[in-house]
Amino acid sequence: MAKAPGFADVKSRLQPPLTAGEARALATAFLLDRLDGVVALSGVVPLLAFTPPAAAPVLRALAPAGVGLLAQRGDGLGERLTCLFDDLLAEHRAALALDADSPTLPMTWVAEGAAMLADGMADVVLGPSEDGGYWSVGLRAPCPALFTDVPWSTDRVLETTLVRARALGLRVRLLPRWFDVDTEADLKKLCDEIAASGGPRRTAALAPTLAARLARAVVE
């Protein structure tokens, strides 16, 4: 799931230290690197759930071959997730939604989550993020109650979702915890990680410039 860079405000919490153009370039790199990673997985159908709908022609030109496009529906994240799973599970036996904000996430974990759902090992798969949310959520059947009255954009998203899932009698499996990039501290962590261990192609190409920008921001 992603906002289309250039059509919606992206990475607003990183402006400053980044300019609007730098934030847009970063979000684009994150998105395309994530799509490349999903396309490389076997046994999955890669789809980009995007907003706003007007971005479809641009995203169709940008997305790797084999990636389908699906415009998000609904108001607010909870309603959008509900609609997304309604759409996907009408045609597929399981679906796993991913963020586009954790570019160095090991894609083997995504494959593990997809396999858990496909093999019937869980009703819900969640990939926790360090900020208290999740980088992934997967389902085998639509479940609107899982996304209703959740305190989105807080550190209680994962906790609330787990409590809700268990109250509904759903079998939950957790994937490893990872970080997403929303704040200046997150961006520094990403740049340090790429400098030490590398990263996906587009994001890694931007990392030296971003690290220099962060260093200038500290000096200034």
Tell me what each language-model feature is.
Residues A25-V44:
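A short, N-terminal amphipathic alpha-helix
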Residues T160-E220:
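Conserved alpha/beta core of the MobA/IspD/sugar-nucleotide pyrophosphorylase nucleotidyltransferase superfamily
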Residues L105-D131:
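Conserved donor-nucleotide/metal-binding helix-loop-beta segment in metal-dependent transferases, i.e.
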